């Protein structure tokens, strides 16, 4: 997909971004990429999408130097998904977003020194020694703005009021299915606010890639989400192939697509099974694990792996499909189709499932787009965001 590339100055940035959102209906902020552009300075690339016609554009702007800091106006008032995206850029690149109410680090510790995706970042072990103490924690957020004279000001906001009831979930908790900490403000059964603490398993993959060749980076994509290893590697080899002008045969395209879909089924079965287990439906969990084994068997015959496959290569595949792959994939589809009704019988249509899930945390289409909630949740709200169509 070729993007319409737009360059904006610091002075025009806030006004023109509002026009893109309100007048040209670029209502979905796909991502924000913080970048060190060398002599140009630090800056960001914003990928925007018009959800009515799926048109995309990229907006590039260079941060302004103010009192020794690099600053860009926040877009959180236009797209709510900018909240965590801007905090990520601040954490790794060091750009301060003016008007953002919570400019704290998101992934790295609060006492981490420097911003690792800058080209001048000190990589020596002495700069950031392995910490032997708990992470310092503040009860305040930080907001940056410019005063009437153009100088940078800092305002602190309290995270919690005296009346807030705060429940700390994680970083190790059976309900999170991963290392994640959530400071949760609740009122009875209603969650009023969540402050996420991420990065407990952050491995610095993007920084590692700066010193690698393209083929060396492939294995790391599989580990971004090992339940979507095929798709993540597919995304990386795809952009490399496009940049190099490599044309793929239809056979390779079909094989990659089928492998992606098989792993998507594998991932969904694990999700459904774990959700059922969390609600106490152990039978549904075992059914999902039983059927997931059949999917993994088909992929293993060709790739040799059941979790991390290492199958896609730049320009092609590790090897051709197993002679039995086509027949076994057809058998798998025939086997799985009637199982959908079985999942509904034992779990989906169960009154306990409905009581626990229906009406809990609903989001309409507008909010899904505003917060960047894609996938099944976004589609369920009426947002047609499936890129396969």
For the regions a protein language model found, what residue spans apply to each?
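Terminal low-complexity/charged segments
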Residues: 1-190, 267, 352-359
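Active-site bordering "gate/hinge" segments
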Residues: 110, 148-177, 185-389
């Amino acid at each position: 997909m070729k993007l319409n590339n737009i360059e904006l100055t610091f002075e025009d940035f806030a006004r023109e971004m509002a026009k893109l959102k309100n007048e040209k209906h670029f209502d979905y902020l796909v991502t924000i990429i913080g970048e060190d552009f060398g002599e140009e300075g630090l800056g960001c690339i914003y990928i925007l999408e018009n959800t009515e016609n799926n048109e995309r554009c990229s907006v590039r702007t260079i941060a302004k130097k103010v009192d020794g800091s690099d600053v860009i106006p926040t877009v959180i008032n236009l797209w709510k998904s900018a909240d965590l995206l801007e905090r990520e850029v601040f954490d790794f690149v060091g750009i301060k977003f003016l008007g953002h109410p919570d400019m704290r680090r998101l992934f790295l510790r609060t006492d981490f020194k420097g911003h690792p995706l800058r080209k001048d970042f000190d990589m020596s072990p002495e700069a950031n020694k392995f910490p032997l103490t708990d992470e310092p924690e503040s009860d305040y957020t930080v907001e940056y703005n410019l005063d009437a004279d153009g100088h940078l000001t800092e305002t602190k906001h309290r995270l919690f009021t005296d009346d807030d009831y705060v429940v700390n979930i994680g970083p190790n908790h059976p309900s999170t299915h991963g290392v994640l900490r959530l400071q949760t403000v609740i009122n009875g059964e209603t969650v009023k606010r969540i402050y996420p603490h991420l990065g407990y398993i952050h491995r610095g993959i993007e920084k590692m890639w700066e010193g690698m060749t393209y083929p060396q980076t492939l294995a790391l994509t599989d580990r971004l989400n090992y339940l979507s290893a095929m798709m993540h590697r597919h995304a990386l080899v795809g952009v490399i192939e496009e940049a190099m002008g490599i044309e793929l045969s239809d056979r390779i395209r079909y094989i990659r697509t089928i492998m992606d879909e098989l792993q998507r089924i594998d991932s969904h079965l694990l999700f459904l099974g774990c959700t059922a287990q969390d609600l106490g439906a152990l039978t549904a969990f075992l059914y999902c694990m039983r059927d997931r084994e059949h999917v993994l068997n088909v992929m293993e015959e060709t790739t040799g792996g059941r979790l991390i496959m290492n199958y896609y290569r730049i320009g092609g595949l590790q090897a051709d499909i197993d002679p039995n792959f086509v027949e076994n994939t057809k058998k798998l589809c025939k086997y799985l189709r009637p199982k959908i009704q079985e999942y509904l019988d034992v779990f989906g249509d169960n009154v306990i499932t409905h009581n626990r899930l229906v009406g809990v945390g609903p989001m309409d289409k507008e909010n899904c787009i505003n917060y960047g909630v894609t996938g099944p949740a976004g589609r369920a709200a009426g947002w047609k965001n499936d890129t396969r169509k």
